[in-house]
């Protein structure tokens, strides 16, 4: 439960790309709650590895809890809510909605993905339409299929 509640704490995309601030804040909070060291480490690993940007690294920590939280996080990123979130974030970052002169990129690594400043439209092809194939649980796969279909309509 703690991993689900804290997985987006101080999300790096709202902190100039700083991927350490979330785990540090969570660790401080968890220590104040006298959480066991093993549970603390497990929650911190969930926070560190839940993001899509870490899907380019095959050496990351995995657990059933992380898989479930990844699925839930990715389900939030697709479908009607995902479309709204995409354009909302694009507006927040002052990105173009569409530019025919900016090609869609198939990101091969975390750095390429994180450094992208592509228009919101490109994000559909660079991430959102890929998510249905990255689900772990049967329930998430079924829900992702429906939400994926909604996006391509």
Please annotate each region the language model reported.
Residues 1-4, 38-46, 62-69:
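Alpha-helical scaffolds flanking conserved acidic
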Residues 1-14, 22, 44-53:
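His-Asp-centered metal-binding catalytic motifs of divalent-metal-dependent phosphohydrolases/nucleases
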Residues 6, 55-153:
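Divalent metal-dependent phosphate-bond-processing catalytic cores, especially two-metal-ion Mg2+/Mn2+ enzymes
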Residues 15-19, 80-81:
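Conserved strand-to-helix beginnings and helix N-cap segments that scaffold or border functional pockets
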Residues 18-32:
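An active-site-proximal "capping" alpha-helix that borders the catalytic cofactor pocket
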């Amino acid at each position: 439960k703690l991993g689900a509640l804290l997985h987006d704490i101080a999300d790096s995309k709202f902190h100039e790309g700083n991927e350490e601030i979330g785990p540090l804040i969570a660790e401080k909070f968890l220590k104040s709650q006298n959480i066991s060291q093993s549970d603390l480490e497990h929650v911190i690993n969930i926070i560190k590895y839940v993001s899509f940007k870490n899907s380019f690294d095959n050496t990351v920590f995995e657990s059933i809890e992380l898989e479930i939280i990844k699925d839930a996080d990715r389900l939030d990123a697709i479908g009607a809510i995902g479309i709204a979130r995409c354009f909302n974030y694009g507006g927040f970052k002052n990105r173009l909605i569409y530019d025919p002169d900016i090609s869609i990129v198939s990101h091969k690594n975390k750095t390429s993905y994180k450094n992208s400043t592509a228009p919101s439209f490109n994000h559909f092809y660079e991430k959102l339409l890929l998510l249905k194939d990255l689900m772990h649980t049967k329930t998430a796969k079924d829900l992702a299929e429906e939400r994926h279909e909604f996006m391509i309509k």
